[in-house]
Curated annotation (Swiss-Prot):
Disulfide cysteine pairs (residue numbers): none
GO cellular component terms listed in the entry, alphabetical order: plasma membrane; proton-transporting ATP synthase complex
Function, as annotated: F(1)F(0) ATP synthase produces ATP from ADP in the presence of a proton or sodium gradient. F-type ATPases consist of two structural domains, F(1) containing the extramembraneous catalytic core and F(0) containing the membrane proton channel, linked together by a central stalk and a peripheral stalk. During catalysis, ATP synthesis in the catalytic domain of F(1) is coupled via a rotary mechanism of the central stalk subunits to proton translocation. This protein is part of the stalk that links CF(0) to CF(1). It either transmits conformational changes from CF(0) to CF(1) or is implicated in proton conduction.
Subunit field text: F-type ATPases have 2 components, F(1) - the catalytic core - and F(0) - the membrane proton channel. F(1) has five subunits: alpha(3), beta(3), gamma(1), delta(1), epsilon(1). F(0) has three main subunits: a(1), b(2) and c(10-14). The alpha and beta chains form an alternating ring which encloses part of the gamma chain. F(1) is attached to F(0) by a central stalk formed by the gamma and epsilon chains, while a peripheral stalk is formed by the delta and b chains.
Cellular location(s): Cell membrane
InterPro entries: ATP_synth_OSCP/delta_N_sf (IPR026015), ATPase_OSCP/d_CS (IPR020781), ATPase_OSCP/dsu (IPR000711)
Alphabetized Pfam families for the sequence: OSCP
GO molecular function, a single term: proton-transporting ATP synthase activity, rotational mechanism
Keywords for this protein: ATP synthesis, Cell membrane, CF(1), Hydrogen ion transport, Ion transport, Membrane, Transport
The keyword Membrane is assigned to this record: yes
Membrane topology summary: Peripheral membrane protein
Protein name: ATP synthase subunit delta
């Protein structure tokens, strides 16, 4: 029975995290995998080629060798391992799971800040720092999503928790109080 994408990502992501932890390279692996993920998302054909069943293992290995130059020996070993088990079609999911494990181990949160207008990086960072401090996180990585419907303020969605500080939400609360 074939594994689901989620189960494959969980198993391989966990194995890579354990390997990095045992070699004392979790931070380096995090950094390199994040860089690799960005590159793969910018050029998805890379994964398609290395997942192509028409190419033989030798051709795939030579392509991978050309790409993995500049990465650590540990990441090269991981990439060769994934290639040998034909798991390159799950590469981004596996990286995402590794990042999830890394963030959990280091008390780093991730989330989305919905705003009516795009904030500058400094504002977003201050918001992230404030939330991280309040909820006992070492750091918080926030992505911004612009949603003019909220009128003003911010809606934070972090690790399953939603804090709605939008003007729209406040107006809805006032409307509800007035209609009682």
């Amino acid at each position: 029975m074939a594994l689901s994408r989620e189960e494959t990502a969980r198993r391989y992501g966990t194995a890579i995290f354990d390997f990095a932890k045992d070699s004392g390279k979790t931070e380096l692996m995090y950094s390199e995998l994040t860089e690799l993920k960005k590159a793969v998302q910018a050029e998805p054909r890379f994964v398609q080629v290395l997942s192509n069943p028409v190419l033989d293992a030798k051709q795939k290995k030579s392509l991978l060798t050309a790409v993995e130059q500049g990465f650590s020996a540990e990441l090269q070993e991981v990439l060769n391992f994934l290639l040998s088990y034909d798991r390159f079609d799950n590469l981004v999911d596996i990286i995402d799971y590794y990042i999830h494990l890394y963030n959990a181990a280091n008390h780093i949160g991730t989330g989305v800040a919905k705003t009516a207008l795009k904030p500058d990086e400094d504002q977003l960072q201050r918001l992230a720092d404030s939330y991280a401090k309040k909820y006992g996180l070492q750091a918080l990585h926030l992505e911004n999503e612009v949603d003019p419907e909220i009128i003003g303020g911010v809606v934070l969605e972090v690790e399953g928790r939603v804090i709605d500080g939008s003007v729209k939400h406040r107006l809805e609360k006032i409307r509800a109080m007035l209609t009682k």
